From Swiss-Prot:
InterPro entries: DNA-dir_RpoC2_beta_pp (IPR012756), DNA-dir_RpoC_beta_prime (IPR045867), RNA_pol_Rpb1_3 (IPR007066), RNA_pol_Rpb1_3_sf (IPR042102), RNA_pol_Rpb1_4 (IPR007083), RNA_pol_Rpb1_5 (IPR007081), Rpb1_funnel_sf (IPR038120). Belongs to the RNA polymerase beta' chain family. RpoC2 subfamily. Pfam families: RNA_pol_Rpb1_3, RNA_pol_Rpb1_4, RNA_pol_Rpb1_5. GO terms for molecular function: DNA binding; DNA-directed RNA polymerase activity; zinc ion binding. It comes from the Bacteria. Its EC number is 2.7.7.6. It comes from Trichodesmium erythraeum (strain IMS101). Its cofactor is Zn(2+). This is DNA-directed RNA polymerase subunit beta'. The gene is rpoC2. Residues 1335-1351 have a biased composition (Polar residues). Zn(2+) binds at residues 214, 294, 301, 304. In cyanobacteria the RNAP catalytic core is composed of 2 alpha, 1 beta, 1 beta', 1 gamma and 1 omega subunit. When a sigma factor is associated with the core the holoenzyme is formed, which can initiate transcription.
């Protein structure tokens, strides 16, 4: 073995260990790894590698790269301010410029390290794969680059510094956006990933290897997985450990591919060597067995699964491959990013290949070139090639270069144009590139200055959508000009006092507003807070002045906020904040209000002149509406001592009363009250101490711990042995000795007997009684119950009141809380009649609310009067000094306190004054209210003197840098407002151009216009929404959410349209709409109507196949399944159509899930995903049960349905019709055969209820259901599916047993892992020792082996070890011990080399750049 003089990095270490493991087994590899570790540590302790600040070398060319980028951006900004490009194009250009700068700087960093300091510790760490990657090194010594904001949009201000130089404050804050996002992301990811794993385990836990070979002829075709040109997973990697379903033939020779003595024939397991041989032979499609097509019922067979990736041998029987698959997919979940990046349309460098001129010269196109003009995403004019041709560059020195241009390429140069070296000539789209779908997005353009709008070359059109809203759209692109001026916002209702063209000075009145009262009334100027003692005198004076007392509400919380900006207000300081107009008021002039303490609660009591006492029910200072209760009479006269029955005698109430408020009395009369005591108990019947119908004395214990308060007869209510209530009815019981029919007694029940009436012969009443028939323990009887009478007057007394307007008054109302005949259950007394004071507001203003005010009395101290007022509050503008967009204001009050004002009267007037002198513009004549006024000031004009007649006329719009006369260019963009003659100093005639400053904004076609020609705008107003298309990156929904979307089989929001029948696509493009149809080979035409915003991605005349996408957007797996099923169903049986449509859907799901993991650089074997997808596509939905027992809508396994259908066709019955179903993992888990497993997952009650109703049985086939009920799981050692077959085999072995046979022949032993304590007692004849580094790969004389090397350039694979005679050695020649010096190296020849070359470092393309916070 020879010495291998090369740096061994991470990848090569992996290969070394893998080689050792495959060829020499576990024990030796473990020892070798141990020795390698010791070696590593030995050298690590001799020299340490650390990073110091000095190791971070910033490339010297950084400054120059940044300067170039900044210059480019300055040029772009200048083009933008001149209106040459739109805001979107500017943004795009800036982002692209910084992206390429960052990329160039990264290359520069690597070049700098390589050329100046290859032993730099940062460089060694990152590039050996020990720690860190190029992306992180770039942030340390390059520049951090562009970052995204919290919404995922890119901020066009890059971080130009790196961590070595330190970040500025701004950069630090931009940086922290991404960091915070990262933290939040990680926290969410862990939970999401865990839940995903749980669902996956649940759906696949019952997949166990139960048989050796299912014997299926089906399989799947394995190809390389690609993204555009880039191969993500080559075929050889996807084949490892699979079993071939068909022979693999070399495409060149047509012979079966062979590696060593192994042939790639059907049922052969693909080892690493064989897979590599197939890859080398250039075979692109290999037909292999797969869990997807395995025909084992409820499991997967060994052959379809292939190797167990844990040990690289065929999977064992009873292996729980479902759980392994679930964990393999779920575990890397935390490494997937969840964040979606809206890059604002940033293109990656992969989209197109650029051709750059390598030398200066002239561009020549052939004569047959067809091109059309095109505007690039940076706003440059270019052309698109419509056919293929060769572009030729002829150099000055006779050099010639030919560049092949493909159809669809963007040409940046014209024919015969002179170009210099380094100029981009063309961008050629990559062939077979992944469809980049686009989406329409809008970007707002805000005005940078205030002024007047003018549209130039802009053609508008109005569109009305289904809802009837009108949008104005730019039919042809153009410019929106803003001509500078000072714009004043006017408050609502302001009236302009000037006209267009008026010259005004500082403080001229521009407009005025009036404050008007709506209802009219008495003016009250609000200035005092509630109950302030120092304001007492003012209030008293005011009270006398307006014949009523007043007290202010609390300071109005409303301050004049309205739609316009605040005003600079010039106001006398004594101007009130608000003015109140009293529209109506009512006052209780004779009643006194006192604050009393009633049962530990403070309450306002109103005492009227006729000694009635009312309790105030509302708080002072609050507002009350029409018909609300203000106060309630405190009256003991209608109080009872217990509950009872109420009956009306002559009393009439309003029918529409609400029981909650009580029934309003319309006509007085008498209320009859029959008292009774009612105890609600709700206890066990055993606690009852009296009988039903028993007569008890007051104080008797009727139920444990409950005593009655009056004498009477008991009535017990019970239900289901629960005692509900006990009623004690007072009265006199008459029973037994009256000669009267029992029937007559019952007729008297519920009647009232008047005094002197004979109830039954011999029984005369002396007072009013209520008769009740009752059953007592002694027999039937009559109970004469006492009746109390309460008199109700027709009208209650109303306190005296004074009002200044008859539209508001207080009315006294009597209300009875119970209806006629109602039984009131109570032990305590209740109130039978309430007298309330209610507010009545007249017809004129029932919607207004009144304020409750308590006013101090002028004569008596400590006494207050109650007053209700209806106020209209008018807020006087007194806004703080705010914005320069406002003129200053002056406000004048036109009323005094106590004035009476008519409805519609003016209370105050506010004038808006100008701050600068100038000319008034922009007032629109017509009906619409004027909201803004523009003043053109001197500062908005530029005067340019010229000697000769200028080449411009009044009204021209010019951009900065335009020549207006020979040698004279204008410094600013703007509008020529005047060209006038002047006299120069020498007396000759000259000219003066007066330019009104302005600024153009470019508007692209299709933009939504939010302003109109001639509008006045303030700085920051949105002028227009630019509509543009940006590419959606393939994974706009990235990482975990995408995996979840696929495995839960969710329908994407806007999916693409799929081809239903193969044929030729026809695309017709009209002005606005695109029509797509497909013509099949038999001439049928299928139309495909496009949805809103869908873009066609097929060309006219292109051949399309079934299931292919016609438009952009994500594919819907349910639609794929349905499309293929409907297509195959026309030609094949339902079963075959089902299998083939499932196959298409499975292929889509496996590849999509793989793509997400690959985009994050995570490798997962296909077979794991296939096991999960198999579970998702196992069931079909029954459409028609035929003669079977299956019901429509049932979900049943396809295999099961097919067995039933086969039986039906034999017996001649009608078969079941079905449709394939794709179930998400959650749904599949809930639809498993085992209800125990499903119930333990989700919706436990529903699953168990359904199982009970259907009488289901659980056959305990999976792991979960066995774990739940505590049995041995049917996997691993508990695997018992083929017990019979196994026991038969054991019997056969026992019969053929030979005691003398030594089955452990020497040489048969594999290298065994000795992990028990007995290993030390075993003796090995010769032991291997890997220790001494110098003897690792040399022979005993120390000479390198001549015949082969540890590594050579052919770099095949590690191959078998031979001795000098050429015979291959097996593992027994290497006893598992130490590689000691007595290892006879001389005899052995390592012909097997380690394939390390693939991984030798060749640049840094393979370093991960997807760090989460960078783009």
């Amino acid at each position: 073995m020879i010495f291998y003089n090369r740096v061994i990095n991470k990848g090569q270490l992996k290969k070394l260990i893998s080689w050792s493991f495959n060829n020499y087994g576990t024990a030796i590899t473990a020892q070798m790894a141990n020795k390698l570790k010791d070696l590593g540590f030995r050298y690590a302790t001799k020299a340490g590698v650390s990073i110091s600040v000095d190791d971070l070398q910033v490339p010297p060319s950084k400054r120059q790269l940044l300067d170039e980028a900044e210059q480019e951006i300055r040029n772009t900004t200048e083009r933008y301010t001149k209106g040459k490009i739109t805001e979107v194009e500017r943004f795009q250009k800036v982002i692209d410029t910084w992206n390429s700068t960052s990329e160039n700087l990264k290359n520069e960093v690597v070049r700098n390290f390589r050329s100046t300091d290859p032993l730099n510790s940062v460089y060694m760490m990152a590039f050996s794969g020990a720690r860190g990657n190029i992306s992180q090194v770039r942030q340390l010594v390059g520049m951090r680059g562009l970052m995204a904001d919290p919404q995922g949009e890119i901020i066009d201000l890059p971080i130009k510094t790196n961590f070595r130089e330190g970040l500025t404050v701004t950069e630090y804050i931009i940086s922290s956006y991404g960091a915070r996002k990262g933290l939040v992301d990680t926290a969410l990811r862990t939970a999401d990933s865990g839940y995903l794993t749980r669902r996956l385990v649940d759906v696949s836990q019952d997949v166990i290897v139960r048989e050796a070979d299912c014997g299926t002829k089906r399989g799947v075709m394995v190809t390389s997985m690609k993204d555009g040109d880039r191969v993500l997973i080559p075929v050889k990697d996807r084949l490892l450990g699979r079993v071939l379903a068909d022979d693999v033939k070399d495409p060149k020779t047509g012979e079966i591919v062979t590696q060593g003595h192994i042939q790639a024939v059907k049922n052969q397991v693909l080892t690493e060597d064989l897979a590599k041989a197939i890859g080398k032979a250039g075979v692109e499609n290999v037909f292999v067995r797969s869990p997807l097509t395995c025909e084992s019922p409820r499991s997967v067979c060994q052959t379809c699964y292939g190797w167990s990736l844990a040990h690289g041998h065929m999977v064992d029987m009873g292996e729980a491959i479902g759980i392994i698959a679930a964990q393999s997919i779920g575990e890397p979940g935390t490494q997937l990013t969840m964040r979606t990046f809206h890059t604002g349309g940033v293109f990656t460098g992969e989209v197109a290949r650029q051709f750059v001129a390598s030398f200066g010269g002239v561009v020549k196109y052939p004569s047959n070139v067809r091109t059309r003009s095109f505007r690039t995403r940076h706003g440059d004019e270019a052309m698109i090639a419509e056919n293929n041709f060769d572009m030729i560059i002829l150099g000055v020195d006779g050099r010639k270069e030919t560049i092949p241009i493909a159809q669809g390429s963007i040409l940046m140069v014209q024919n015969n144009q002179q170009v210099s070296a380094g100029i981009v000539l063309a961008e050629v789209p990559k062939v077979g590139q992944v469809r980049k779908t686009t989406e329409k997005v809008t970007k707002e353009v805000a005005s940078d200055l205030a002024g007047e709008l003018k549209f130039a070359q802009l053609v508008q059109e109005e569109k009305v959508d289904k809802q009837g809203t009108t949008t104005r759209i730019a039919q042809r692109g153009g410019l929106i000009w803003i001509l500078e001026g000072e714009v004043y916002n006017l408050p609502p209702g302001a009236e302009a006092m000037v006209k267009n063209g008026t010259r005004i000075n500082i403080n001229s009145v521009l407009a005025e507003t009036k404050l008007v009262t709506e209802h009219g009334g008495v003016i009250r100027i609000s200035s005092s807070p509630l109950y302030s003692p120092e304001k007492q005198n003012e209030t008293n004076v005011l009270a006398q002045a307006t014949q009523e007392s007043t007290i202010d509400e609390l300071e109005a919380s409303m301050t004049g906020t309205s739609a316009q900006l605040p005003i600079n207000t010039e106001m006398p300081d004594n101007l009130p904040r608000e003015i109140e107009v009293i529209t109506a008021s009512v006052r209780l002039d004779q009643a006194k209000v006192r604050l009393e303490s009633i049962s530990n609660r403070e309450q306002y009591i109103i005492e009227t002149q006729n000694d009635q006492r009312f309790a105030l029910k509302v708080t002072p200072g609050s507002k009350v509406g029409n018909h609300e209760v203000i106060a309630e009479l405190l009256d003991e006269n209608y109080q009872t001592s217990t509950g009872g029955i109420i009956k009306y005698a002559g009393v009439e109430v309003l029918k529409r009363g609400k029981a909650k408020q009580g029934y309003e009395v319309v006509k007085g009369g008498t209320l009859l009250w029959i008292p009774e005591e009612c105890h609600e108990v709700n206890k066990d019947i055993s606690l009852l101490l009296v009988e039903d119908g028993q007569y008890v004395e007051a104080g008797t214990e009727i139920v444990k711990d409950i005593f009655c308060q009056s004498n009477g007869v008991t009535e017990v209510h019970q239900k289901n042995d629960i005692l509900r209530e006990v009623v004690i009815k007072p009265g006199k019981l008459h029973s037994g000795n009256y000669e009267i029919d029992l029937g007559d007694l019952t007729l008297m029940d519920g009647q009232i007997a008047t005094p002197g009436e004979e109830v039954i012969p011999g029984l005369v009443t002396s007072e009013l009684k209520y008769i009740e028939y009752i059953e007592t323990p002694e027999g039937p009887g009559l109970l004469l119950r006492p009746v109390t009478e309460f008199h109700v007057p027709d009208e209650p007394g109303v306190p005296s009141q004074k009002s200044i307007n008859s539209s508001i008054e207080l009315r006294a109302v009597q209300r009875i809380p119970f209806k006629d005949g109602e039984r009131v259950k109570s032990v305590e007394g209740i109130e039978l009649l309430r007298t309330q004071l209610v507010l009545e507001i007249g017809e004129e203003a029932p919607q207004l609310a009144a304020d409750i005010e308590l006013l101090p009395d002028l004569e008596e101290e400590g006494i207050m009067r109650l007053q209700l007022v209806i106020l209209e509050s008018l807020v006087i503008r007194r806004d703080v000094v705010a914005d320069t967009t406002q003129g200053s204001t002056s406000t004048r009050l036109l009323v005094k306190d106590g004035d009476v004002i008519e409805a519609g009267g003016v209370v105050s007037r506010t004038q808006i004054l100008s701050k600068k002198s100038g000319e008034v513009r922009g007032i629109r004549e017509g009906s619409e209210a004027i909201r803004r006024i523009l003043i053109v000031r001197e500062a908005d004009l530029v005067k340019i003197p010229v000697n000769t007649l200028p080449s411009v006329v009044e009204g021209d719009l010019l951009v900065a840098g335009t020549e207006i006369a020979p040698g004279i260019v204008i410094p600013r963009s703007g509008l020529v407002s005047k060209v006038e003659e002047t006299v120069l100093n020498d007396g000759s005639k000259g000219y003066q151009v007066i330019l009104r400053k302005g600024r153009p904004y470019r508007v692209s076609t299709g933009a939504v216009l939010l302003t109109m020609d001639g509008d006045l705008v303030q700085r920051g107003d949105i002028l227009v929404l630019l509509v543009f298309e940006r590419t959606k990156t393939g994974d706009i929904i990235q990482g975990l959410p995408r995996i979840e979307e696929l495995l839960e089989a969710r329908k994407p929001k806007e999916s693409c349209i799929l081809v239903k029948y193969p044929g030729q696509a026809q695309v017709n493009v009209n002005d606005d709409n695109v029509e797509v149809s497909v013509v099949s080979s038999d001439g049928t035409i299928t139309d495909y109507p496009l949805g809103h915003g869908q873009n066609v991605i097929v060309a006219d005349g292109q051949n399309v196949n079934v299931g292919e996408a016609l438009t952009d957007g994500p594919q819907n797996p349910h639609e794929i399944l349905e499309t293929f099923f409907n297509y195959y169903r026309e030609h094949e049986s339902a079963y075959e159509a089902c299998l083939r449509s499932f196959e298409a859907c499975q292929r889509f799901l496996v590849n999509q899930v793989q793509a997400v993991y690959q985009s994050q650089g995570i490798d997962i074997s296909d077979k794991h995903i296939e096991v999960i997808v198999r579970q998702m596509t196992a069931k079909v939905r029954i459409d028609d049960g035929g003669d079977t027992t299956m019901l429509p809508g049932e979900l049943i396994e396809l295999r099961q349905v097919e067995q039933v259908n086969e039986a039906m066709s034999i017996t001649g019955g009608a078969t079941a019709q079905y449709t394939p179903m794709l179930l998400g993992i959650t749904k599949a888990s809930l639809n498993t055969d085992s209800f125990i497993s499903a119930a333990s997952f989700q919706e436990t009650t529903r699953v168990l209820t359904e199982a009970a109703i259907e009488g289901k049985s659980d056959w305990l086939r999976g792991l979960k259901e066995n774990v739940i009920i505590g049995r041995l799981i049917p996997a691993g050692t508990g695997f018992n599916a083929y017990e019979d077959a196994l026991s038969a085999e054991i019997n056969r072995l026992e019969q053929n047993w030979d005691d003398d046979l030594d089955i452990f022949e020497e040489g048969d032993l594999q290298s065994v892992v000795l992990d028990d304590q007995t290993a030390r007692s075993l003796e090995f004849e010769n032991s291997l020792n890997l220790s001494s580094a110098n003897q690792n790969f040399v022979d005993s004389q120390g000479k390198p082996q001549s015949q082969s090397s540890f590594i050579d350039d052919s770099m095949s694979e590690f191959s078998p070890v031979k001795d000098k005679s050429g015979s291959v050695l097996d593992d027994s020649d290497f006893p598992p011990g130490n590689f000691d010096s007595d290892f006879p190296a001389d005899n052995y020849d390592l012909e097997h080399e380690i394939d390390l070359e693939d991984d030798v470092y060749d640049g840094y393309d393979d370093f991960d750049e997807n760090t989460p916070d960078l783009i």
